[in-house]
């Protein structure tokens, strides 16, 4: 890991307090936005583009192909109106386990959400029941004691007595009042039910809940049949730029996704491996080598790891991606801006430190999916990124990267030598852009 900031003594207080007047200049660190109900109109997408969105993320954990296609058409119109280009990312559902609180299509989160939240009480029994058939889902009744799991037929086989289960609102923001921890008491294989004890009080809101099961490891596939269908019939069809491969566990998961893309001549589409489970960490080096980029999903990863371990794993993964020359993306940043116009001081510092750690892009989830301040969030994150970049020691970082590459791979390749020469020349003349 390398020193990436200038010496504090060399910066000077006057420079720190200097007002940044370059509001029209975009940050070098890119901003990825998850598009949802509140941000999918042409008007809102135009605001996101003008605020600094670089990549639009289409999350296939919910919504039909027709729904996402309509959103994509709106994005293209917004790009035409603003004359600002934007890449597209398809995020697979992967092995995510879900609970629906309403039978309707979850494309319209607010409209279909139950009017009153489910009240969870510590010590109460909760039954998780497999409910995979469409007819059963239409007739299901959800209560604080009964949760239907809609997309995991093998639930009873992958859990064990004593396992911890976390349930939170889709793209949960970490609030202890809107998520619940359960402990598995017994498993009824015949009736496909798991009986649990609730460990905390909570108010469960929204239409879609996600379920995180401890020790699940590689028991569920990274790419389901639905994921393959989404990639081929929507991603390839619409020429997406990136695939976000949810719950990547190994390099083979990436290779499988690449084979699907290659079979359909989608050679340009890049694959970003999403690190969401602790089990993926033992394969992190081979995943980085195989993927085009890595997304550190701190939300899901944080439910499986002690909080004090997340920061050092972030620094380690970002550093290894930088040395390997792979895209490094950090998720879960300014959760409070889903409901507030400003981030907390801790969140603002977290964003800046992500930039200084070497993140190439920052991924916004609930803030732009269902948040009330989507474009304001993008503008704020971009401002923090730009401020952090003012004090980023690019030259020292560059020299450290070259040295590290020589240590790990011997002499640099011809392509790397050409690229490094271009960077040196650009730095010396103060170039704003390098055109390849």
Residue ranges and their predicted role:
Residues 1-436:
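Non-catalytic helical/linker scaffolds that mediate oligomerization, partner binding
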């Amino acid at each position: 890991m390398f020193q990436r900031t200038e010496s504090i003594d060399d910066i000077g207080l006057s420079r720190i307090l200097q007002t940044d007047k370059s509001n029209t200049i975009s940050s070098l660190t890119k901003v990825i936005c998850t598009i949802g109900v509140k941000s999918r109109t042409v008007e809102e997408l135009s605001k996101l583009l003008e605020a600094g969105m670089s990549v639009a993320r289409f999350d296939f954990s919910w919504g039909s192909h027709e729904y996402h296609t309509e959103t994509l058409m709106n994005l293209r119109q917004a790009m035409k109106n603003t004359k600002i280009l934007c890449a597209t990312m398809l995020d697979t559902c992967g092995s995510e386990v879900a609970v629906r609180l309403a039978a309707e299509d979850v494309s319209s989160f607010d409209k279909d959400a139950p009017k009153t939240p489910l009240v969870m009480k510590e010590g109460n029994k909760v039954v998780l029941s497999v409910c995979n058939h469409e007819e059963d889902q239409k007739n299901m009744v959800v209560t604080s004691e009964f949760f239907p799991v809609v997309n995991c037929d093998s639930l009873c086989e992958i859990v064990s007595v004593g396992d911890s289960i976390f349930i939170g609102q889709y793209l949960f923001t970490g609030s202890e009042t809107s998520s619940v921890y359960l402990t598995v008491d017994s498993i009824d294989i015949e009736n496909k039910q798991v009986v649990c004890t609730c460990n905390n009080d909570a108010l469960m809101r929204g239409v879609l809940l996600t379920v995180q099961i401890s020790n699940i490891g590689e028991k569920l596939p990274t790419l389901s049949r639905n994921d393959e269908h989404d990639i081929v019939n929507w991603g390839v069809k619409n020429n997406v730029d990136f695939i976000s491969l949810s719950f990547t566990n190994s390099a083979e998961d990436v290779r499988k996704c690449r084979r699907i893309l290659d079979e359909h001549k989608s050679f340009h589409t890049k694959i970003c491996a999403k690190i969401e489970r602790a089990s993926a960490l033992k394969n992190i080096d081979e995943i980085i080598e195989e993927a085009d980029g890595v997304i550190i999903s701190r939300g899901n990863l944080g439910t499986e790891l002690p909080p004090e371990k997340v920061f050092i794993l972030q620094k380690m993964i970002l550093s290894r991606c930088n040395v390997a020359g792979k895209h490094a993306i950090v998720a879960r940043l300014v959760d409070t801006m889903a409901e507030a116009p400003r981030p907390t001081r801790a969140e603002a510092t977290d964003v800046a430190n992500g930039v200084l750690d070497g993140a190439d892009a920052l991924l916004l989830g609930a803030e732009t999916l269902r948040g009330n301040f989507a474009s304001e969030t993008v503008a704020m994150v971009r401002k923090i990124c730009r401020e952090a970049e003012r004090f980023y020691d690019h030259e020292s970082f560059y020299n450290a990267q070259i040295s590290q590459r020589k240590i790990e791979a011997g002499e640099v390749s011809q392509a790397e030598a050409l690229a490094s020469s271009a960077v040196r020349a650009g730095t010396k003349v103060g170039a704003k852009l390098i055109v390849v």
